[in-house]
Amino acid sequence: AEETCKVIRDCGFDMQLMLGPGLISEVNNPGCPWNKTNYSEEELKQRAERNDRNIDELIRIANENSDVINSVSVGNENTPQWGENNVPIERLISFARRLKEGTGKPVTFNEGVYEWEHLKQLADELDIISIHSYPLWNGNNVEEALEVNKTWYKKVKEWYPGKPIVFSEVGWATDCADFKQMREGQANEENQKKYYEEFWKWSDREQI
């Protein structure tokens, strides 16, 4: 992160960053399909302490690079049932408060659109709602994708009126070996181009 800030500043790039921590799990999650690790209480305590240090480091970097960093994030996809790096909501809330007090920057949290309905306690502490949307992974084709994004954006706006909402992750795969979640034939460069062009046109028009 610090090197990225330096490059932006030294090269005079007209851009700023959202800075977030690399949180690791503070709870065991048997619902994660690919990580069945059962951490001991002592290991979970050590992992929580590591997250606390990461938040402290984030505050330091944000303050030392205030001209380049425009917002700070509490975490990234730390609440889904399938998540590998889940963190209790009360801990995420405490991180949000620490970041707001420690940096003075707008505070956000990055999570999949379908999780935000259940995150009101956390959202109350945030200045910005950052959403991730991947219609292809949810079985939609490229013709449906933009309407899916519009629908989710409208829902999140209804859940949290008055909160700015940004798409912090969007994407369209160009290849996939496993089509269990995707419609076969949809992951290709042509569809990716179409998806991005339609998405940016819509988001620019709506000033999202």
What are these regions (language model features)?
Residues 7, 32-33, 85-89, 122-124, ...:
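Short, glycine/charged-enriched secondary-structure capping and boundary segments
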Residues 2-4, 53-60, 110-121, 147-155, ...:
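Alpha-helical scaffolding within the catalytic cores
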Residues 1-2, 172:
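Gly/Ser/Thr-rich loops at beta-strand to alpha-helix junctions
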Residues 19-21, 25, 30, 69-70, ...:
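Aromatic- and acid-rich polysaccharide-binding/catalytic face
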Residues 3-105:
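Substrate-binding cleft of extracellular glycoside hydrolase catalytic domains
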